[in-house]
Amino acid sequence: MFGFAGTDYEKVRGDFRKVTDPYSGNEIFVVPAIRPDWAVIHAIRADGNGNVVCSALEADRLAVLAARQAIVTVEEVVPAEDLVARPGEIFLSALHIDLVVAAPLGAHPAGCVHSYGIDRAHMEEYLAASKTAEGFSEYLSRFVLGKTEEEYRELACGKAV
């Protein structure tokens, strides 16, 4: 990893190692791979088998590939034939996905490429609320706890889907 030279990471993180890059000869830091139990990502669409079409966010792909199991929430579950007809759009193979869940507006208040943008007003409300434990608790009570997906969408987005 670049950018750690001259920092205290080497002292405070015993699992960071400085090694010689075999390609450049420069000293670099390496870190152990993360192996989470689960990865959960949101995508544009997938078929029921788990073949996923989403924006080319490499972080999403890496999270799924690193995890022992993966869930993908999607704007739309489509028939497998729709994806087979356009194999170049498949970003993640069903081999890596354990569960597909239809969740329209599931990325809200963040955006979902080709579907909807960031809800800046709601994101600002969330960020302001999350600055304190009390504010975050109030946010959860208002928008999340005890709410159905439809109730959340109505409260947060002003529409039901």
What are these regions (language model features)?
Residues 1-161:
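Conserved alpha/beta enzyme-core scaffold
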